[in-house]
Design a protein with these regions (language model features):
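Mobile active-site "lid"/loop adjacent to the S-adenosyl-L-methionine
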Residues: 223-253
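A short N-terminal interaction module
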Residues: 2-52, 56-60
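A general structural signal for well-ordered alpha-helical segments in protein cores
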Residues: 10, 29-30, 60, 73, ...
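Short glycine/threonine-rich catalytic loop with a Thr-x-Gly-x-Asp
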Residues: 96, 125, 251
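Non-membrane alpha-helical structural segments and their capping/turn regions in soluble enzymes
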Residues: 7, 149, 252-256
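Conserved Class I SAM-dependent methyltransferase catalytic core
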Residues: 249-273
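Conserved SAM/SAH cofactor-binding pocket of Class I
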Residues: 101-198, 202-231, 257
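Conserved AdoMet
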Residues: 34-109
């Protein structure tokens, strides 16, 4: 690989991905080149014949090989863009989808007249929905809930990186089952800063009643019927977490989560999306 240039490396990556049947072979090859080299597209067009080091070429072709194996691009770069923000993602969370932005936009529209809204994001995953709302509404606070502790680690990381940690709290719970034991954001962040865990624990002030009224519950739960998962593209069925996809027999299992909410959640203004 001596004397490999940016242009030559990109062409090689495009060819490998195209032969592997990757739909966006050209774009993905470019994005991986940008990720590995740190060079912008403008730099590439100006200095495409510039040589790259052997280590850079090897790293690039390694990622190209993994992408050719249908590992999602975002799992390779650990970057996903949603509502204009960059989120960290890995194999433990769904990659944020652009069409989910309409859910965030609808929530923001519904809460226009609500001052200091409190939001519950059920099945939070990477936290992209809740965090995006908090970025748009500086007066808002929210709780993100997920069954997966590994997913919650990702959500906490994103809340810190995007500077909304003081407005967010995260709870490990099977839907509403543990919601009586909400861990407040400040205490939660202190705990995870010391120990890399998101296991459900109560704050030191354990005599507090953590039930509260939410202005909105928002959720993008698993909705794919079990039998249809095998028909999905490899990037999804082989690499996205199964529990984030599987909506059980008819795909509607988790839409029933609203039936149980009244036991522990009080509504003030807006409602359930």
């Amino acid at each position: 690989m001596n004397g490999e240039t940016l242009t030559g490396l990109l062409k090689k990556g495009q060819m490998i991905l195209a032969q592997a049947g990757i739909k966006e072979a050209g774009l993905d090859a470019w994005l991986l080149l940008e990720y590995v080299t740190g060079k912008s597209r403008a730099y590439y067009f100006a200095y495409g014949e510039e040589s790259v080091t052997e280590s850079v070429a090897e790293r690039y072709l390694e990622l190209i090989s993994r992408r050719a194996g249908h590992i999602p691009l975002q799992h390779l770069t650990h970057q996903a863009f949603f509502m204009g923000h960059e989120f960290y993602v890995d194999k433990n969370v769904l990659v944020p989808r652009q069409d989910t932005e309409t859910l965030v936009e609808s929530a923001l529209e519904c809460m226009k007249a609500v001052k200091n809204p409190y939001i519950l994001d059920m099945c939070t995953g990477s936290g992209c929905i809740l965090i995006s709302i908090l970025k748009e509404r500086a007066d808002a606070h929210g709780t993100g809930v997920d069954l997966s502790d590994e997913a919650l680690k990702v959500a906490v990381r994103n809340a810190r990186t995007l500077e909304v940690a003081e407005h967010a709290e995260f709870v490990q719970s099977n839907l509403f089952s543990e919601m009586q034991n909400i861990v407040y954001g400040t205490e939660y962040m202190k705990r995870t800063a010391v120990k890399d865990t998101v296991k459900m624990t109560e704050c030191e002030n354990s005599n507090r009643n953590y039930s509260r009224a939410y202005d909105m519950i928002i959720s993008n739960p698993p909705y794919i019927p079990t039998a249809e998962i095998e028909d999905l593209m490899d990037e999804v069925k082989l690499h996205d977490p199964r529990m984030a996809l599987d909506g059980m027999e008819d795909g509607l299992y988790f839409t029933g989560l609203s039936r149980n909410r009244h036991r522990i959640i009080l509504f003030r203004v807006v409602g359930f999306i």
